[in-house]
Amino acid sequence: MNLSIVILAAGAGTRMKSKTPKVLHTLCGREMLYYVIKEAKKLSDDVSVVLFHESEMVKKSIEKYFSDIRYVIQDHVNYPGTGGALMGIEPKYQKILVLNGDMPLVEAEELKQFLRAGSDFVMSVLDLEDGSGYGRVVIHGGSVERIVEEKDATGEEKSLGTVNAGVYLFDRALLACYLPRLKNDNAQKEFYLTDVVEMARKDRLIVAPLFVKEENFKGVNSKADLAEAEAIMTGRIRRRWMREGVRMRLPETIYIDEGVKFVGECFIENGVSITGDSYIEESHIKAHSVIEESRVIRSDVGPMAHLRPQCEVTETHIGNFVEVKKSKLTGVKAGHLSYLGDCEVDEGSNIGAGVITCNYDGKKKHLTKIGKNVFVGSDSQLVAPVSIEDDSIIGAGSTITKNVKSGELALSRAKQENIAGFFARYFSSSK
Protein backbone atom coordinates (compact mmCIF):
# COMPACT_ATOMS: atom_id res chain seq x y z
CA MET A 1 0.00 0.00 0.00
CA ASN A 2 1.49 3.38 -1.04
CA LEU A 3 1.12 5.01 2.34
CA SER A 4 3.57 6.56 4.80
CA ILE A 5 2.63 6.45 8.47
CA VAL A 6 3.94 8.79 11.15
CA ILE A 7 3.37 7.96 14.83
CA LEU A 8 3.65 10.82 17.31
CA ALA A 9 5.34 9.55 20.48
CA ALA A 10 7.37 12.50 21.76
CA GLY A 11 5.33 13.48 24.81
CA ALA A 12 6.23 12.81 28.44
CA GLY A 13 2.66 12.05 29.52
CA THR A 14 2.72 13.98 32.80
CA ARG A 15 -0.85 12.94 33.66
CA MET A 16 0.37 9.35 33.99
CA LYS A 17 2.35 10.54 37.05
CA SER A 18 5.21 8.18 36.26
CA LYS A 19 8.90 8.26 35.35
CA THR A 20 8.14 5.86 32.50
CA PRO A 21 7.41 7.57 29.15
CA LYS A 22 3.69 7.39 28.42
CA VAL A 23 4.00 5.26 25.28
CA LEU A 24 6.01 2.62 27.20
CA HIS A 25 3.29 1.92 29.74
CA THR A 26 2.12 -1.61 29.13
CA LEU A 27 -1.20 -3.32 28.65
CA CYS A 28 -1.45 -7.07 28.24
CA GLY A 29 2.32 -7.38 28.44
CA ARG A 30 3.23 -5.01 25.60
CA GLU A 31 3.98 -1.30 25.43
CA MET A 32 1.24 0.99 24.09
CA LEU A 33 3.46 2.05 21.22
CA TYR A 34 3.97 -1.60 20.22
CA TYR A 35 0.28 -2.01 19.39
CA VAL A 36 0.16 1.16 17.28
CA ILE A 37 3.23 0.12 15.29
CA LYS A 38 1.90 -3.43 14.84
CA GLU A 39 -1.31 -2.12 13.24
CA ALA A 40 0.58 0.49 11.20
CA LYS A 41 2.85 -2.15 9.69
CA LYS A 42 -0.19 -4.04 8.40
CA LEU A 43 -0.78 -1.04 6.11
CA SER A 44 2.66 0.34 5.26
CA ASP A 45 6.34 -0.48 4.84
CA ASP A 46 7.21 3.15 5.65
CA VAL A 47 6.57 3.76 9.35
CA SER A 48 8.25 6.61 11.24
CA VAL A 49 8.05 7.28 14.97
CA VAL A 50 8.63 10.82 16.27
CA LEU A 51 10.40 10.83 19.65
CA PHE A 52 11.72 13.33 22.16
CA HIS A 53 11.17 12.47 25.84
CA GLU A 54 13.45 9.55 26.83
CA SER A 55 13.95 8.78 23.15
CA GLU A 56 16.71 6.19 23.66
CA MET A 57 14.62 4.29 26.20
CA VAL A 58 11.68 4.21 23.79
CA LYS A 59 13.85 3.06 20.87
CA LYS A 60 15.44 0.28 22.92
CA SER A 61 12.03 -0.99 24.02
CA ILE A 62 10.53 -1.03 20.53
CA GLU A 63 13.57 -2.51 18.77
CA LYS A 64 12.85 -5.79 20.60
CA TYR A 65 9.87 -6.22 18.27
CA PHE A 66 10.53 -4.18 15.12
CA SER A 67 13.82 -3.68 13.31
CA ASP A 68 12.68 -1.63 10.31
CA ILE A 69 11.18 1.45 11.96
CA ARG A 70 12.54 4.94 11.26
CA TYR A 71 12.94 7.23 14.26
CA VAL A 72 12.81 11.01 14.08
CA ILE A 73 13.88 13.08 17.09
CA GLN A 74 11.71 16.18 17.39
CA ASP A 75 13.42 19.55 17.77
CA HIS A 76 11.37 20.30 20.86
CA VAL A 77 13.25 23.51 21.63
CA ASN A 78 12.56 25.29 18.36
CA TYR A 79 9.51 23.36 17.13
CA PRO A 80 7.42 22.03 20.02
CA GLY A 81 3.88 20.72 19.58
CA THR A 82 2.13 18.31 17.24
CA GLY A 83 2.81 20.47 14.21
CA GLY A 84 6.49 20.74 15.10
CA ALA A 85 6.64 16.95 15.39
CA LEU A 86 6.01 16.58 11.65
CA MET A 87 8.59 19.11 10.51
CA GLY A 88 11.48 16.62 10.49
CA ILE A 89 9.81 13.71 8.70
CA GLU A 90 10.75 12.44 5.23
CA PRO A 91 7.79 10.40 3.96
CA LYS A 92 8.32 7.88 1.18
CA TYR A 93 4.82 8.02 -0.29
CA GLN A 94 2.28 10.61 -1.38
CA LYS A 95 -0.28 9.86 1.33
CA ILE A 96 0.68 10.40 4.99
CA LEU A 97 -1.34 8.96 7.88
CA VAL A 98 -0.61 10.56 11.26
CA LEU A 99 -1.31 8.43 14.37
CA ASN A 100 -0.73 8.90 18.08
CA GLY A 101 1.47 6.56 20.10
CA ASP A 102 -0.99 6.57 23.01
CA MET A 103 -3.82 4.93 21.02
CA PRO A 104 -3.12 1.21 21.58
CA LEU A 105 -6.64 0.13 20.58
CA VAL A 106 -6.47 1.44 17.01
CA GLU A 107 -7.00 -1.26 14.36
CA ALA A 108 -5.69 -1.47 10.80
CA GLU A 109 -9.08 -2.30 9.28
CA GLU A 110 -10.58 0.94 10.53
CA LEU A 111 -7.54 2.93 9.41
CA LYS A 112 -8.21 1.78 5.84
CA GLN A 113 -11.29 4.00 5.90
CA PHE A 114 -9.06 7.08 5.72
CA LEU A 115 -7.86 5.99 2.29
CA ARG A 116 -11.37 5.12 1.15
CA ALA A 117 -12.55 8.65 2.03
CA GLY A 118 -11.03 9.87 -1.25
CA SER A 119 -9.78 13.22 0.05
CA ASP A 120 -6.37 14.88 0.32
CA PHE A 121 -7.14 15.86 3.91
CA VAL A 122 -9.10 13.53 6.21
CA MET A 123 -9.63 14.15 9.92
CA SER A 124 -10.94 11.63 12.44
CA VAL A 125 -13.98 12.71 14.44
CA LEU A 126 -15.74 11.18 17.45
CA ASP A 127 -19.44 11.73 18.07
CA LEU A 128 -19.85 11.76 21.86
CA GLU A 129 -22.88 12.32 24.03
CA ASP A 130 -20.80 14.69 26.12
CA GLY A 131 -17.82 16.41 24.55
CA SER A 132 -16.65 18.08 27.77
CA GLY A 133 -12.89 18.36 27.97
CA TYR A 134 -12.37 18.11 24.21
CA GLY A 135 -11.96 20.62 21.43
CA ARG A 136 -15.20 20.74 19.42
CA VAL A 137 -15.21 20.07 15.69
CA VAL A 138 -17.53 22.33 13.72
CA ILE A 139 -18.68 20.66 10.48
CA HIS A 140 -20.40 22.58 7.70
CA GLY A 141 -21.33 21.42 4.21
CA GLY A 142 -19.56 18.07 4.55
CA SER A 143 -16.25 19.62 5.59
CA VAL A 144 -14.59 20.37 8.90
CA GLU A 145 -14.96 24.12 9.27
CA ARG A 146 -12.82 24.64 12.36
CA ILE A 147 -11.73 23.15 15.68
CA VAL A 148 -12.68 25.19 18.74
CA GLU A 149 -10.97 24.67 22.08
CA GLU A 150 -13.47 24.27 24.91
CA LYS A 151 -12.39 27.45 26.67
CA ASP A 152 -13.01 29.42 23.47
CA ALA A 153 -16.29 27.74 22.48
CA THR A 154 -19.65 29.49 22.46
CA GLY A 155 -22.62 27.97 24.26
CA GLU A 156 -23.88 26.52 20.99
CA GLU A 157 -20.47 25.06 20.15
CA LYS A 158 -20.15 23.52 23.62
CA SER A 159 -23.38 21.61 22.98
CA LEU A 160 -21.70 19.79 20.08
CA GLY A 161 -20.64 16.18 20.65
CA THR A 162 -18.29 16.11 17.66
CA VAL A 163 -14.67 16.12 18.86
CA ASN A 164 -11.24 15.63 17.34
CA ALA A 165 -9.95 12.02 17.62
CA GLY A 166 -6.40 13.09 16.67
CA VAL A 167 -5.73 10.97 13.55
CA TYR A 168 -5.22 12.58 10.14
CA LEU A 169 -4.57 11.66 6.52
CA PHE A 170 -2.69 14.26 4.47
CA ASP A 171 -1.48 14.54 0.92
CA ARG A 172 2.27 15.09 1.09
CA ALA A 173 2.11 18.25 -1.04
CA LEU A 174 -0.59 19.71 1.21
CA LEU A 175 1.47 19.10 4.32
CA ALA A 176 4.59 20.54 2.69
CA CYS A 177 2.60 23.67 1.90
CA TYR A 178 1.12 24.28 5.34
CA LEU A 179 3.71 23.07 7.85
CA PRO A 180 6.17 25.95 7.18
CA ARG A 181 3.29 28.42 7.67
CA LEU A 182 2.39 27.21 11.16
CA LYS A 183 2.84 29.77 13.95
CA ASN A 184 3.24 29.35 17.68
CA ASP A 185 1.44 32.52 18.77
CA ASN A 186 -0.57 30.77 21.48
CA ALA A 187 -0.39 30.41 25.26
CA GLN A 188 1.70 27.22 25.05
CA LYS A 189 4.03 28.61 22.37
CA GLU A 190 3.61 25.38 20.41
CA PHE A 191 2.99 24.57 16.75
CA TYR A 192 -0.42 22.88 16.51
CA LEU A 193 -1.27 20.45 13.74
CA THR A 194 -4.92 21.40 14.16
CA ASP A 195 -4.11 24.88 12.78
CA VAL A 196 -3.66 23.24 9.38
CA VAL A 197 -7.45 22.77 9.29
CA GLU A 198 -8.08 26.50 9.41
CA MET A 199 -5.42 27.18 6.77
CA ALA A 200 -6.91 24.60 4.43
CA ARG A 201 -10.42 26.00 4.84
CA LYS A 202 -9.19 29.52 4.09
CA ASP A 203 -7.83 28.09 0.84
CA ARG A 204 -11.29 26.55 0.18
CA LEU A 205 -10.03 22.98 0.54
CA ILE A 206 -12.27 20.18 1.79
CA VAL A 207 -11.29 18.71 5.17
CA ALA A 208 -13.24 15.44 5.13
CA PRO A 209 -14.53 14.36 8.56
CA LEU A 210 -14.32 10.63 9.21
CA PHE A 211 -16.45 9.42 12.11
CA VAL A 212 -14.65 6.63 13.97
CA LYS A 213 -15.37 4.29 16.91
CA GLU A 214 -14.55 5.75 20.30
CA GLU A 215 -13.22 2.40 21.57
CA ASN A 216 -10.60 2.11 18.81
CA PHE A 217 -9.41 5.72 18.98
CA LYS A 218 -9.35 6.08 22.74
CA GLY A 219 -6.25 7.95 23.88
CA VAL A 220 -4.57 6.86 27.11
CA ASN A 221 -3.66 9.82 29.31
CA SER A 222 -3.95 8.44 32.84
CA LYS A 223 -3.67 5.20 34.81
CA ALA A 224 -7.47 5.01 34.77
CA ASP A 225 -7.47 5.25 30.96
CA LEU A 226 -4.80 2.55 30.86
CA ALA A 227 -6.91 0.19 32.96
CA GLU A 228 -9.92 0.72 30.67
CA ALA A 229 -7.81 0.12 27.56
CA GLU A 230 -6.30 -3.05 29.04
CA ALA A 231 -9.76 -4.43 29.78
CA ILE A 232 -10.74 -3.90 26.15
CA MET A 233 -7.47 -5.35 24.83
CA THR A 234 -7.60 -8.52 26.92
CA GLY A 235 -11.17 -9.03 25.72
CA ARG A 236 -9.93 -8.88 22.13
CA ILE A 237 -7.15 -11.35 22.91
CA ARG A 238 -9.58 -13.81 24.50
CA ARG A 239 -12.01 -13.60 21.57
CA ARG A 240 -9.19 -14.11 19.08
CA TRP A 241 -8.06 -17.34 20.75
CA MET A 242 -11.60 -18.63 21.20
CA ARG A 243 -12.10 -18.18 17.46
CA GLU A 244 -8.97 -20.32 17.05
CA GLY A 245 -10.57 -23.11 19.09
CA VAL A 246 -9.41 -22.46 22.66
CA ARG A 247 -12.17 -23.21 25.17
CA MET A 248 -12.54 -20.75 28.04
CA ARG A 249 -14.80 -21.05 31.06
CA LEU A 250 -16.13 -17.65 32.17
CA PRO A 251 -13.74 -15.87 29.78
CA GLU A 252 -14.32 -12.46 31.34
CA THR A 253 -12.40 -13.70 34.43
CA ILE A 254 -9.36 -14.87 32.43
CA TYR A 255 -6.30 -12.67 31.80
CA ILE A 256 -4.05 -13.42 28.80
CA ASP A 257 -1.07 -11.38 27.61
CA GLU A 258 -0.53 -10.42 23.97
CA GLY A 259 2.55 -12.65 23.69
CA VAL A 260 0.83 -15.87 24.80
CA LYS A 261 0.42 -18.60 22.18
CA PHE A 262 -2.01 -21.53 22.20
CA VAL A 263 -1.63 -24.60 19.98
CA GLY A 264 -4.17 -27.40 19.57
CA GLU A 265 -7.15 -28.04 21.80
CA CYS A 266 -6.71 -26.17 25.08
CA PHE A 267 -9.14 -25.60 27.94
CA ILE A 268 -8.65 -22.58 30.21
CA GLU A 269 -10.82 -22.41 33.31
CA ASN A 270 -12.03 -19.33 35.19
CA GLY A 271 -9.70 -17.01 37.07
CA VAL A 272 -6.56 -18.07 35.17
CA SER A 273 -3.73 -15.61 34.41
CA ILE A 274 -1.26 -16.42 31.61
CA THR A 275 1.46 -13.84 31.00
CA GLY A 276 4.62 -13.11 29.04
CA ASP A 277 5.39 -15.20 25.97
CA SER A 278 3.95 -18.37 27.46
CA TYR A 279 3.25 -21.32 25.15
CA ILE A 280 0.32 -23.64 25.88
CA GLU A 281 -0.19 -26.76 23.74
CA GLU A 282 -2.98 -29.34 24.09
CA SER A 283 -3.31 -28.59 27.80
CA HIS A 284 -5.88 -28.00 30.53
CA ILE A 285 -5.24 -25.03 32.82
CA LYS A 286 -7.55 -25.28 35.81
CA ALA A 287 -9.18 -22.53 37.85
CA HIS A 288 -7.17 -19.69 39.42
CA SER A 289 -3.78 -20.89 38.19
CA VAL A 290 -1.01 -18.44 37.25
CA ILE A 291 1.41 -19.16 34.40
CA GLU A 292 4.27 -16.73 33.76
CA GLU A 293 6.61 -16.94 30.76
CA SER A 294 6.48 -20.76 30.62
CA ARG A 295 5.80 -23.67 28.27
CA VAL A 296 3.03 -26.17 29.02
CA ILE A 297 2.69 -29.11 26.61
CA ARG A 298 0.08 -31.89 26.86
CA SER A 299 -0.28 -31.29 30.59
CA ASP A 300 -2.83 -30.28 33.19
CA VAL A 301 -2.08 -27.51 35.66
CA GLY A 302 -4.01 -26.57 38.79
CA PRO A 303 -6.35 -25.60 40.20
CA MET A 304 -4.53 -22.82 42.05
CA ALA A 305 -1.06 -23.73 40.78
CA HIS A 306 1.72 -21.27 39.97
CA LEU A 307 4.28 -21.67 37.18
CA ARG A 308 6.85 -18.90 37.52
CA PRO A 309 9.12 -17.86 34.62
CA GLN A 310 11.26 -20.33 32.66
CA CYS A 311 9.28 -23.49 33.36
CA GLU A 312 8.88 -26.24 30.77
CA VAL A 313 6.20 -28.76 31.67
CA THR A 314 5.51 -31.68 29.30
CA GLU A 315 3.02 -34.53 29.77
CA THR A 316 2.89 -33.64 33.44
CA HIS A 317 0.25 -33.27 36.15
CA ILE A 318 0.67 -30.18 38.32
CA GLY A 319 -1.91 -30.17 41.11
CA ASN A 320 -3.31 -27.60 43.50
CA PHE A 321 -0.98 -25.30 45.44
CA VAL A 322 2.11 -26.46 43.56
CA GLU A 323 4.65 -23.75 42.72
CA VAL A 324 7.28 -24.38 40.04
CA LYS A 325 10.09 -22.00 39.11
CA LYS A 326 12.77 -22.24 36.40
CA SER A 327 12.34 -26.00 36.10
CA LYS A 328 11.89 -28.71 33.49
CA LEU A 329 9.37 -31.47 34.23
CA THR A 330 8.70 -34.29 31.77
CA GLY A 331 6.14 -37.02 32.48
CA VAL A 332 5.89 -36.08 36.16
CA LYS A 333 3.15 -36.08 38.79
CA ALA A 334 3.26 -33.33 41.41
CA GLY A 335 -0.20 -33.39 42.91
CA HIS A 336 -0.25 -31.00 45.83
CA LEU A 337 1.46 -28.48 48.09
CA SER A 338 4.99 -28.53 46.65
CA TYR A 339 7.71 -26.07 45.69
CA LEU A 340 9.93 -27.14 42.79
CA GLY A 341 12.52 -24.48 42.02
CA ASP A 342 15.62 -24.80 39.81
CA CYS A 343 15.13 -28.48 39.16
CA GLU A 344 14.94 -31.09 36.42
CA VAL A 345 12.54 -34.00 36.94
CA ASP A 346 12.37 -36.88 34.46
CA GLU A 347 9.52 -39.12 33.33
CA GLY A 348 7.68 -41.46 35.64
CA SER A 349 8.65 -39.62 38.80
CA ASN A 350 6.15 -38.77 41.55
CA ILE A 351 6.52 -35.77 43.83
CA GLY A 352 4.63 -36.20 47.11
CA ALA A 353 2.68 -33.56 49.01
CA GLY A 354 4.79 -30.97 50.83
CA VAL A 355 8.03 -31.67 48.93
CA ILE A 356 10.39 -28.70 48.71
CA THR A 357 13.55 -28.20 46.69
CA CYS A 358 15.78 -26.04 48.91
CA ASN A 359 17.47 -24.24 46.03
CA TYR A 360 18.89 -21.11 47.71
CA ASP A 361 21.83 -21.06 50.11
CA GLY A 362 21.58 -17.37 50.92
CA LYS A 363 23.98 -16.37 48.14
CA LYS A 364 23.01 -18.25 44.98
CA LYS A 365 20.57 -20.79 43.54
CA HIS A 366 21.48 -24.46 43.01
CA LEU A 367 20.10 -27.25 40.82
CA THR A 368 18.18 -30.35 41.92
CA LYS A 369 18.18 -33.27 39.45
CA ILE A 370 15.60 -36.04 39.79
CA GLY A 371 15.84 -38.98 37.39
CA LYS A 372 13.26 -41.40 35.98
CA ASN A 373 10.75 -43.34 38.07
CA VAL A 374 11.75 -41.66 41.32
CA PHE A 375 9.29 -41.64 44.22
CA VAL A 376 9.75 -38.66 46.53
CA GLY A 377 7.74 -39.18 49.73
CA SER A 378 5.62 -36.45 51.28
CA ASP A 379 7.12 -33.66 53.38
CA SER A 380 10.66 -34.19 52.08
CA GLN A 381 13.26 -31.48 51.60
CA LEU A 382 15.82 -31.81 48.82
CA VAL A 383 18.76 -29.54 49.66
CA ALA A 384 20.46 -28.44 46.43
CA PRO A 385 22.80 -29.05 44.81
CA VAL A 386 21.68 -32.66 44.87
CA SER A 387 21.02 -35.47 42.40
CA ILE A 388 18.47 -38.29 42.79
CA GLU A 389 19.15 -41.00 40.21
CA ASP A 390 16.66 -43.27 38.39
CA ASP A 391 14.48 -45.84 40.18
CA SER A 392 15.12 -44.54 43.68
CA ILE A 393 12.88 -43.72 46.65
CA ILE A 394 12.97 -40.87 49.14
CA GLY A 395 11.21 -41.81 52.36
CA ALA A 396 8.52 -39.43 53.60
CA GLY A 397 9.74 -36.69 55.92
CA SER A 398 13.39 -36.95 54.84
CA THR A 399 15.88 -34.11 54.44
CA ILE A 400 18.20 -35.10 51.60
CA THR A 401 21.60 -33.40 51.47
CA LYS A 402 23.62 -36.08 49.62
CA ASN A 403 23.23 -37.60 46.17
CA VAL A 404 21.06 -40.73 45.93
CA LYS A 405 22.18 -43.47 43.52
CA SER A 406 19.94 -45.53 41.26
CA GLY A 407 17.83 -48.12 43.06
CA GLU A 408 18.49 -46.76 46.56
CA LEU A 409 16.07 -45.89 49.36
CA ALA A 410 17.09 -42.69 51.14
CA LEU A 411 15.88 -41.99 54.70
CA SER A 412 16.96 -39.23 57.06
CA ARG A 413 14.61 -39.04 59.99
CA ALA A 414 14.74 -40.12 63.65
CA LYS A 415 13.58 -43.64 64.38
CA GLN A 416 10.03 -43.68 65.75
CA GLU A 417 9.73 -44.77 69.37
CA ASN A 418 6.37 -45.77 70.95
CA ILE A 419 6.25 -45.55 74.79
CA ALA A 420 3.50 -47.70 76.32
CA GLY A 421 1.35 -46.19 79.09
CA PHE A 422 2.75 -42.70 78.62
CA PHE A 423 -0.64 -40.97 78.24
CA ALA A 424 -1.91 -42.08 81.63
CA ARG A 425 1.35 -41.25 83.41
CA TYR A 426 1.62 -37.84 81.76
CA PHE A 427 -1.84 -36.59 82.59
CA SER A 428 -2.06 -38.18 86.03
CA SER A 429 1.09 -36.40 87.09
CA SER A 430 -0.47 -33.00 86.36
CA LYS A 431 -3.40 -33.51 88.73
From Swiss-Prot:
Acetyl-CoA binds at residues 353, 359-360, 378, 396, 413. Residues 1-223 are annotated as: Pyrophosphorylase. SUPFAM superfamilies: Nucleotide-diphospho-sugar transferases, Trimeric LpxA-like enzymes. GO terms for molecular function: glucosamine-1-phosphate N-acetyltransferase activity; magnesium ion binding; UDP-N-acetylglucosamine diphosphorylase activity. One of its GO terms (cellular component) is cytoplasm. The active site is at residue 336. Mg(2+) binds at residues 102, 221. Keywords: Acyltransferase, Cell shape, Cell wall biogenesis/degradation, Cytoplasm, Magnesium, Metal-binding, Multifunctional enzyme, Nucleotidyltransferase, Peptidoglycan synthesis, Repeat, Transferase. Gene3D superfamilies: Hexapeptide repeat proteins, Spore Coat Polysaccharide Biosynthesis Protein SpsA, Chain A. Disulfide bonds: none annotated. GO terms for biological process: cell morphogenesis; cell wall organization; lipid A biosynthetic process; peptidoglycan biosynthetic process; regulation of cell shape; UDP-N-acetylglucosamine biosynthetic process. Residues 224-244 are annotated as: Linker. In the N-terminal section; belongs to the N-acetylglucosamine-1-phosphate uridyltransferase family. It catalyses: alpha-D-glucosamine 1-phosphate + acetyl-CoA = N-acetyl-alpha-D-glucosamine 1-phosphate + CoA + H(+); N-acetyl-alpha-D-glucosamine 1-phosphate + UTP + H(+) = UDP-N-acetyl-alpha-D-glucosamine + diphosphate. Pathway: Nucleotide-sugar biosynthesis; UDP-N-acetyl-alpha-D-glucosamine biosynthesis; N-acetyl-alpha-D-glucosamine 1-phosphate from alpha-D-glucosamine 6-phosphate (route II): step 2/2; Nucleotide-sugar biosynthesis; UDP-N-acetyl-alpha-D-glucosamine biosynthesis; UDP-N-acetyl-alpha-D-glucosamine from N-acetyl-alpha-D-glucosamine 1-phosphate: step 1/1; Bacterial outer membrane biogenesis; LPS lipid A biosynthesis. This is Bifunctional protein GlmU. Residues 245-431 are annotated as: N-acetyltransferase. Catalyzes the last two sequential reactions in the de novo biosynthetic pathway for UDP-N-acetylglucosamine (UDP-GlcNAc). The C-terminal domain catalyzes the transfer of acetyl group from acetyl coenzyme A to glucosamine-1-phosphate (GlcN-1-P) to produce N-acetylglucosamine-1-phosphate (GlcNAc-1-P), which is converted into UDP-GlcNAc by the transfer of uridine 5-monophosphate (from uridine 5-triphosphate), a reaction catalyzed by the N-terminal domain. UDP-N-acetyl-alpha-D-glucosamine binds at residues 8-11, 22, 74, 81-82, 135, 149, 164, 221, 308, 325, 339, 350. Its EC number is 2.7.7.23, 2.3.1.157. Binds 1 Mg(2+) ion per subunit. Its cofactor is Mg(2+).
